[in-house]
Amino acid sequence: DIANAVWQIAEGLGDTSHWDFTRLMAIREANEAQIAEGADDDRFPVYPQRLVADIRRVLPSEGIVALDNGIYKIWFARNYKAHKPNTVLLDNALATMGAGLPSAMAAHLVYPDRPVISVCGDGGFMMNCGDGGFG
């Protein structure tokens, strides 16, 4: 159980009040600033950071994003701020193309009152579009 493992690690660390996170916080702030730069970029075709920011703006905190595989998954993994646990679905280990749409469909079945969006490319969509009557 991860909670137990984290608890044991924390117990083993002892006093951490002397730790200095100044440099780490500066790196985080620089990263946040870089992400914010692209959030309102109006270039065409759409800038990936803009797409991620727009989806974050319109999707409520309990909304679910199901990602297929493609370079956009990296943009979401780096730039999308999940406000609640289990609201970003991605298959990181095997990079399974075509998983985004069925993941979104399953999420909607499990959480019918929450908005769900699938982000997938043409190939991933075509692999499963018949499952939802889209084909």
Language model feature labels by segment:
Residues 18-22, 66, 115-118:
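Acidic/polar loop patches that form or flank catalytic/metal-binding clefts of enzymes
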Residues 1-25:
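Glycine-rich, acidic loop regions that bind phosphate or pyrophosphate groups
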Residues 10, 101, 105, 117-119, ...:
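Hydrophobic, well-ordered secondary-structure segments
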Residues 26-113:
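Active-site diphosphate/adenylate-binding microenvironment
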Residues 13, 82-83, 135:
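Short secondary-structure boundary/capping segments
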Residues 110-135:
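Conserved thiamine diphosphate
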Residues 5-6, 73-75, 97, 125-127:
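Flexible loop/turn segments at secondary-structure boundaries
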